[in-house]
């Protein structure tokens, strides 16, 4: 027996019919409450409640209860009251629906029909038995009817029970000692039972009755006599003799019986001997005698749909809910043994402190019937699937039911893929748990709108008033020094000071003994003179001595001296550790100004200052400092500590504890994921074990629901050396079917590679730097995990420029041709090598090394590409999304590359596209020291049906003025720089020679000497324009070319006459310079390593104004040409409110008002462009404005909450601005 709950009530009760049942209680008639209250209240208790002392709901009743019963459909609770009233309650609405006074005396018992939920029978003190229809109780003239005529005397009806098979038959027991069977069809008593003691011959009063759960002819009765406390079972087909007589269980009268509806072998009884007994009525044996209570146990009942549980009510002021199963262990035996061996002194010393913890006495172990009848017809499977046998038993179906609370988190999944968390943030803001949780999501909203660096710069900057003071002092100081002469020139006569106190100092100065002069000045407490002497001496030791003397004297009383000490030491540790926390922003300025060179030290000091703020209770500002200090772990530790509190608050909003826990867990993971993406682009690797356990739990729930893709995405962020992570990842991979597929592909690729090596004799030898070396045939080994080449579906080339992501390895030696290899054919050139179609035929370098090509099909024979003779007609290479195979896995950038497809910012005239010119692939090589030679790859006439992947999104976060992303404008053409040169298109211009990205090596850093500007060579107006097309041969990286001069100059490209029918336009020489600058400005820059994001100083960094997107433009108050006349009142009212409250708010709320202004402008822009906002949303804005004008802020806020909850996809950043402005307007409405 395990006690699950205990409710401090002396009350009768009834169970609901839920799988997780609810208990209804009503104060027992005749019982006196602890507070001597006469009020009677029906109370509902949830077994899942944290606080067992408070009911989940209550409703005042008309009197105290003798009995309670819950209808089978859980819609009605009926109460038998001591004042003769039968009262009906609605448990969901928590109200009384009817009170009917039909009985002449107290109503003693009542019972709902097992077959018809609306039929009820009640019994009273004067032998009254009435049958009720709960569907008609709302009628004012309704009256129940009598059960019929009794053949035996009935005094007080004490027990009623319906037949479980026949809806018109019920049984009753009364104080007269008879148990009667009634038939409502005949409207009379049809049978009666009585029993006389076999020892005394005295009639045994049968006061309790209950029907068999499945048989319509078997019934159980019990005696309330203390001399004959019997439980008897009867078969009505032989009603003269009981089937079984259950004795030796109770020592006093039995007051309650309950036959388990799920197992006819279990019968529960309780009585005046303070105990409850579990019987096997079929065998007539005792199974368990439960621990005695402090008073009579007048009612014990199984939970109808959870028979493992039963409740018992006693006059000891407790209702106890417990389980049938007795968890036996050796601790009880050990405790009893230790008590028996205790000395007499130990016994008497502990007798008052020993708690009474009686255990149930299990006589016979018997498993309930429902444990042995586990149906194989349906079983749960991993991934939230339900496997079910079909109705005919010949098939199996697998379904995935949608369970409330376990739905797929579609919004979170989409946000992770698109890296756009605005909709997720809006959803969480509309479903905030508490004020602290709302602050966190407001922070994330600001990061999404402004970007991390810009938001922190604004949040950590000094107040506007203090900034004005600093600026004014700087101006005054500049004016003061401008008025001073450049050099002090002494004038006029003077005398040396040989006074008694100054004579030694003057003598030391005359002699030039500055050390002694300094000591003398310090003895006389002449700190100013000592500092001048120390400066004059140019002696570091003397200067330190003078400064230490100053700090020793003034640091305790002067804050300025402590500040000067930190400045002198170039160390702000003292500032961070000891400054008053109210001046934390000034400490932040110290940290940024004096730790510019040491990023790690700056971050550690910011975290340390954040710890001090958190200790003082300033959670919001502490999180700002942790964010600035790049400390996700510190923020996570705060959120983990707050997790139980949020979970407790969610319990009142959810039906179960599990749903509350799951919702809190999901919200926590979403919040942390959004923050980590904004802080370090989602590349964080978790190390906090508590945080890892939370993510593992979320992964487990997500995978169990079948969302394996989301589970794997989060598993990648967890450490691989964690055993639980390894196990979970393997489980998810197997369940998603990815492990078997990968292994099969690997085995197939390996076997193909081995057979190819055996046939052609090619082997792979590792190089010194770890990169794969080409085989003997001059061809790199294929990637065994690469997808097989698909045959071409079209021959039409799709010219799309793309930055190379990887470059195939080449050999530095001339390969030996394979005599058994088939003739070489032109293969498709990898897209990473050639960015666009060449428009000229470069000359052949006869001394260049022959390049090898990479075949697109790893299973085809490997040809060797030979140089193509000059002038050979070769078709232009078709450019498509898929390139040939390389000997290594392509390096995929997790982060977008800045400048991947940047567009020129100046609109140019659209050029005329030149016709393609036949070119021949030429093997070219540019030697460089210390690097392997890079050769060209021959072209191919074949094409492929694969397409280019979409360009990576831009990671640069800039302030936005609109919620939805805007589509970039189309590429703008460039001006022609030479009237005799072919026109250079914008597409070609973006394909300047790029740095070659090697997946096995970190990307090269950009040349600092050329960062941000480009060299513009002199332009010859009569020379051919430089082509922006990457030559067929591989060009070495810019950094290597700039650093290492090539001993052999690269051959010059021959000029090609312009194509026919080309439009020409004369330009000035200056235009060529401008175009050259423009070409340099749009070249892409190498991306830093993915796992080492650059640390951005949020305050000291200088922001590039050119990086701000076109949408981040200040909107003037009078702007609104695109706003319709119907929407203009919204704009005018909000603008007027902003102007009204601006002079009324305190100085410390200036930033909040600026934020409101920025958000309101976002709304205005949406209204101007007629995007994002639908008409229902605009209508609600009109309603908000109308209530706002009337001063009805509560109604306006209600509509605001409706917008936030039901229109979250449209309610972007602007909705928060309306809420804040409304709060400010309400606070200043009386001013």
UniProtKB/Swiss-Prot annotation:
Taken from the UniProt entry, a GO cellular component term is: COPII vesicle coat
The protein's matches in InterPro entries, at most eight in alphabetical order, are given as: Sec31, SEC31-like, SRA1/Sec31, WD40/YVTN_repeat-like_dom_sf, WD40_repeat_dom_sf, WD40_rpt
* GO terms for biological process, alphabetical: COPII-coated vesicle cargo loading; endoplasmic reticulum organization; protein transport
Where is the sequence biased in composition, kind Pro residues? 779-791
Record keywords: Cytoplasmic vesicle, Endoplasmic reticulum, ER-Golgi transport, Membrane, Protein transport, Repeat, Transport, WD repeat
Q: Where is the composition biased (Polar residues)?
A: 737-767, 976-998
WD repeat extents: 6-46, 60-99, 102-142, 152-192, 201-244, 249-289, 292-332, 379-399
In alphabetical order, the GO MF annotations are: structural molecule activity
Using the UniProt annotation, give all residue ranges assigned to the region (Disordered): 725-802, 941-1012
The subcellular localization recorded is: Cytoplasmic vesicle, COPII-coated vesicle membrane; Endoplasmic reticulum membrane
Q: Main subcellular localization, coarse class?
A: membrane
SMART domains in UniProt: WD40
How is this protein situated with respect to the membrane?
A: Peripheral membrane protein
- Partners and quaternary state? The COPII coat is composed of at least 5 proteins: the SEC23/24 complex, the SEC13/31 complex, and the protein SAR1. SEC13 and SEC31 make a 2:2 tetramer that forms the edge element of the COPII outer coat. The tetramer self-assembles in multiple copies to form the complete polyhedral cage. Interacts (via WD 8) with SEC13.
Q: What does this protein do?
A: Component of the coat protein complex II (COPII) which promotes the formation of transport vesicles from the endoplasmic reticulum (ER). The coat has two main functions, the physical deformation of the endoplasmic reticulum membrane into vesicles and the selection of cargo molecules.
As for family, the record states: Belongs to the WD repeat SEC31 family.
> What is the designated name of this protein?
Protein transport protein SEC31
* Species annotation: Kluyveromyces lactis (strain ATCC 8585 / CBS 2359 / DSM 70799 / NBRC 1267 / NRRL Y-1140 / WM37) (Yeast)
């Amino acid at each position: 027996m395990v006690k699950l709950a205990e409710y401090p009530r002396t009350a009768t009760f009834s169970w609901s019919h839920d799988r997780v049942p609810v208990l209804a209680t009503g104060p027992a008639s005749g019982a006196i409450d602890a507070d001597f209250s006469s009020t009677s209240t029906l109370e509902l208790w949830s077994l899942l409640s944290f606080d067992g002392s408070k009911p989940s709901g209550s409703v005042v009743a008309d009197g105290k209860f003798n009995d309670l019963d819950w209808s089978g459909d859980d819609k009605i609770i009926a109460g038998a009251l001591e004042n003769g009233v039968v009262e009906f309650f609605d448990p969901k609405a928590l109200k009384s629906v009817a009170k009917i006074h039909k009985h002449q005396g107290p109503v003693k018992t009542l019972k709902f029909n097992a077959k018809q939920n609306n039929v009820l029978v009640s019994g009273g003190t004067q032998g009254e038995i009435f049958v009720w229809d709960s569907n008609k109780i709302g009628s004012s003239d309704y009256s129940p009817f009598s059960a019929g005529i009794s053949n035996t005397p009935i005094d007080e009806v004490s027990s009623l029970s319906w037949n479980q098979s026949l809806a018109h038959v019920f049984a009753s027991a009364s104080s007269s000692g008879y148990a009667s069977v009634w038939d409502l069809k005949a409207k009379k008593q049809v049978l009666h039972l009585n029993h006389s003691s076999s020892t005394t011959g005295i009639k045994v009063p049968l006061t309790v009755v209950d029907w068999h759960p499945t048989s319509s002819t078997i019934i159980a009765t019990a005696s309330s006599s203390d001399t004959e406390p019997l439980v008897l079972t009867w078969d009505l087909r032989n009603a003269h003799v009981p089937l079984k007589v259950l004795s030796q269980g109770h020592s006093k009268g039995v007051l309650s019986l309950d036959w388990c509806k799920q197992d006819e072998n279990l019968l529960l009884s309780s009585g005046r001997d303070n105990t409850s007994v579990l019987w096997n009525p079929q065998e007539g044996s005792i199974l368990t005698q439960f621990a005695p209570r402090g008073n009579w146990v007048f009612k014990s009942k199984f939970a109808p749909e959870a028979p493992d549980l039963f409740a018992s009510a006693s006059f000891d002021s407790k209702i106890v809910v417990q389980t049938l199963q007795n968890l036996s262990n050796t601790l009880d035996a050990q405790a009893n043994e230790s008590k028996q061996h205790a000395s007499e002194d130990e016994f008497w010393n502990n007798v008052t402190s020993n708690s009474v913890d009686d255990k149930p006495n299990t006589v016979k172990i018997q498993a309930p019937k429902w444990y042995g009848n586990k149906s194989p017809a349906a079983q749960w499977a991993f991934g939230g699937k339900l496997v079910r046998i079909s109705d005919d038993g010949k098939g199996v179906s697998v379904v995935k039911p949608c369970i409330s609370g376990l739905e797929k988190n579609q919004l979170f999944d989409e946000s992770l893929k698109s890296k756009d968390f605005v909709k997720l943030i809006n959803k969480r803001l509309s479903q905030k748990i508490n004020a602290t949780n709302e602050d966190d999501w407001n922070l994330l909203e600001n990061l999404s709108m402004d970007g991390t660096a810009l938001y922190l710069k604004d949040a950590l900057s000094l107040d506007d008033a203090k900034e004005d003071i600093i600026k004014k002092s700087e101006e005054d100081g500049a004016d003061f020094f401008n008025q001073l002469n450049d050099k002090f020139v002494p004038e006029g006569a003077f005398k040396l000071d040989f006074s008694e106190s100054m004579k030694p100092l003057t003598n030391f100065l005359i002699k030039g003994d500055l050390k002694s002069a300094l000591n003398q000045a310090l003895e006389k407490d002449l700190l100013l003179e000592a500092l001048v002497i120390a400066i004059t001496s140019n002696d570091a030791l003397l200067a330190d001595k003078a400064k230490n003397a100053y700090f020793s004297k003034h640091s305790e009383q002067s804050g300025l001296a402590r500040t000067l000490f930190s400045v002198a030491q170039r160390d702000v540790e003292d500032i961070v550790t000891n400054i008053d926390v109210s001046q934390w922003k000034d400490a932040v300025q110290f940290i940024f100004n004096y730790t510019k060179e040491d990023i790690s030290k700056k971050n550690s000091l910011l975290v340390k200052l954040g710890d001090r703020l958190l200790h003082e209770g300033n959670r919001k500002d502490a999180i700002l400092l942790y964010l600035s200090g790049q400390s996700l772990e510190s923020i996570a530790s705060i959120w983990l500590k707050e997790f139980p509190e949020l979970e407790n608050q969610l319990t009142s909003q959810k039906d179960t504890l599990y749903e509350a826990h799951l919702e809190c867990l999901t919200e926590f993971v979403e919040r942390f994921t959004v923050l980590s993406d904004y802080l370090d682009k989602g590349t964080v690797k978790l190390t906090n074990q508590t945080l890892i356990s939370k993510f593992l739990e979320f992964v487990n729930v997500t995978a169990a629901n079948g969302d394996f893709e989301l589970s794997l995405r989060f598993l990648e962020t967890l450490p691989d050396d964690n055993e639980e992570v390894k196990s979970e990842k393997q489980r998810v991979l197997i369940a998603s079917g990815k492990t078997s597929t990968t292994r099969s592909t690997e085995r197939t690729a390996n076997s193909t590679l081995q057979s190819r090596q055996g046939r052609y004799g090619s082997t792979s030898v590792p190089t010194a730097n770890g990169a794969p070396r080409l085989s003997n045939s001059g061809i790199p080994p294929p990637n065994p995990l690469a997808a097989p080449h698909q045959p071409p579906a079209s021959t039409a080339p799709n010219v799309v420029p793309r930055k190379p992501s990887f470059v195939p390895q080449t050999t530095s030696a001339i390969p030996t041709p394979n005599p058994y290899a088939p003739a070489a054919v032109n293969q498709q050139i990898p897209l990473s090598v050639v960015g666009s179609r060449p428009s000229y035929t470069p000359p052949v370098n006869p001394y260049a090394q022959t390049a090898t090509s990479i075949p697109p099909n790893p299973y085809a024979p490997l040809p060797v590409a030979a140089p193509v003779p000059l002038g050979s007609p070769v078709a232009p290479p078709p450019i498509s999304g898929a390139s040939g195979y390389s000997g290594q896995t392509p390096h995929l950038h997790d982060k977008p590359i800045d400048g991947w497809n940047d567009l020129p910012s100046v609109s140019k005239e659209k050029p005329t596209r030149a016709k393609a010119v036949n070119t021949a692939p030429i093997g070219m090589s540019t030697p460089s020291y210390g690097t392997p030679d890079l050769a060209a790859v021959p072209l191919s006439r074949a094409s492929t049906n694969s397409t280019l992947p979409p360009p990576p999104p831009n990671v640069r976060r800039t302030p936005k003025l609109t919620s939805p992303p805007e589509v970039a404008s189309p590429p703008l053409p460039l001006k022609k720089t030479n009237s005799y040169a072919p026109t250079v298109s914008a597409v070609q211009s973006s394909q300047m020679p790029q740095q070659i990205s090697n997946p096995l090596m970190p990307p090269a850093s950009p040349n600092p000497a050329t960062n941000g500007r480009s060299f513009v060579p002199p332009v010859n107006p009569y020379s051919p324009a430089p082509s922006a097309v990457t030559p067929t041969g591989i060009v070495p990286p810019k950094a290597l070319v700039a650093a290492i001069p090539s001993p052999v100059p690269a051959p010059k490209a021959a000029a090609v006459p312009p194509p026919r029918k080309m439009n020409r336009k004369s330009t000035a020489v200056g235009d060529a310079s401008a175009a050259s600058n423009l070409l340099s400005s749009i070249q892409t820059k190498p991306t830093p390593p993915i796992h080492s994001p650059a640390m951005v100083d949020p305050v000291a960094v200088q922001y590039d104004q050119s990086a701000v997107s076109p949408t981040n433009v200040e909107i003037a108050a009078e702007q609104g040409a695109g706003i319709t006349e119907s929407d203009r009142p919204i704009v005018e009212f909000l603008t007027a409110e902003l102007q009204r409250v601006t002079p009324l708010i305190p100085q410390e709320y200036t930033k909040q008002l600026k934020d409101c202004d920025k958000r309101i402008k976002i709304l205005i822009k949406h209204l101007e462009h007629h995007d994002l906002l639908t008409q229902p949303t605009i209508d609600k804005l009109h309603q908000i404005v109308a209530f706002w004008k009337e001063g009805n802020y509560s109604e306006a806020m209600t509509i605001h909450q409706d917008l936030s909850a039901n229109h979250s996809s449209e309610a972007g950043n602007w909705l928060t601005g309306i809420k804040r402005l409304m709060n400010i307007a309400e606070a200043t409405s009386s001013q």
